[in-house]
Amino acid sequence: MVEADRPGKLFIGGLNTETNEKALEAVFGKYGRIVEVLLMKDRETNKSRGFAFVTFESPADAKDAARDMNGKSLDGKAIKVEQATKPSFESGRRGPPPPPRSRGPPRGLRGGRGGSGGTRGPPSRGGHMDDGGYSMNFNMSSSRGPLPVKRGPPPRSGGPPPKRSAPSGPVRSSSGMGGRAPVSRGRDSYGGPPRREPLPSRRDVYLSPRDDGYSTKDSYSSRDYPSSRDTRDYAPPPRDYTYRDYGHSSSRDDYPSRGYSDRDGYGRDRDYSDHPSGGSYRDSYESYGNSRSAPPTRGPPPSYGGSSRYDDYSSSRDGYGGSRDSYSSSRSDLYSSGRDRVGRQERGLPPSMERGYPPPRDSYSSSSRGAPRGGGRGGSRSDRGGGRSRY
């Protein structure tokens, strides 16, 4: 960093405060012609600060003077004479500041991550998507394993289920999506455990995605619209679920509600979505979900079509309903339901909302309630109910 100020300029330090420019010029003048003598003085007192700069016309003269005078005594004080250098602050100053920035990114990531995590549960709705997304992403991607695990387990633990159960309608809605995830999770938990182990990968994966998956998928669906894909994945999975659920159906029956919840979660979420969200994305989700659950084929349309959505809902719902029904009924129902779903959807949509409302549906009801949206919904639900009854 040290640079010569300019050739021929010497720094003279350690001067006696009494030494003045004339004395310096007299002492250093013998080495060569001096261009400038600059004695540094205090601004206020005008007293010498003990150092000066002497500039020689010839750099060679300056070197000689520095060599001879350095360490010599002048006016009773040993002086220091050397090539003058530019103040370090001028040359050196610019560099340092930059470093601090690095922190930002991590934070973001952190945020994202945390966020997603955070979102996952509660934010259900938006979060949900995110959650889903995240979950999805997380789950699906890296996290999938982990998150799902997280996801799955907690549900197992019962954390989520409570969510599911406790939160009933509204919360569900919020939870709903969250619920959904949880639900799915729950599923994991419920159905999951049993199946989960076997399915884990799939389930986790799916579920994760699926559980999350649901959300995820939902997310996906909503997000990706892979509804078809979701549908695909889901649909089967749902079926799996369905089976699973069915299998577990009894438990799931509880679950059904839950399962439904799950589904309802879907459905419900759906509903929620409906109510809370307005269902929009939920719908979408639902649609997806529906599409998913519901016949995949339908899925795609559902994905976005609002109407289809409803239909989807209905259908899917029915699907769900069907599933539900299936749940209620059994796997076979499942199939039937699948069929029924379809049929039911057709028939189910309108059927009996009242019925739909029935307790079983409470969840639904809640959902449906939430869902005032369409008879379809209620209907499907009813169907569900009906389906249930049917089955």
Swiss-Prot record:
- The Gly residues compositionally biased stretches are 109-120
SUPFAM superfamilies according to UniProt: RNA-binding domain, RBD
Q: Where is this region: Disordered?
A: 61-391
Subcellular localization is given as: Nucleus
- Upper classification of the organism: Eukaryota, Metazoa, Chordata, Craniata, Vertebrata
Q: Which organism is it from?
A: Homo sapiens
**Which residue windows does the record flag with biased composition (Basic and acidic residues)?**
61-80, 194-215, 241-274, 338-347, 380-391
Q: What is one GO biological process annotated to this record?
A: transcription by RNA polymerase II
Protein name per Swiss-Prot or TrEMBL: RNA-binding motif protein, X chromosome
Q: Where is this cross-link: Glycyl lysine isopeptide (Lys-Gly) (interchain with G-Cter in SUMO2)?
A: 22, 80, 86
Compositional bias segments (type: Low complexity): 323-337, 362-371
Modifications made to the protein after synthesis? O-glycosylated.
Per UniProt, what is the name of the gene that codes for the protein in this document? RBMX
Q: Is the keyword Transcription in the record?
A: yes
N-acetylmethionine PTM sites in chain numbering: 1
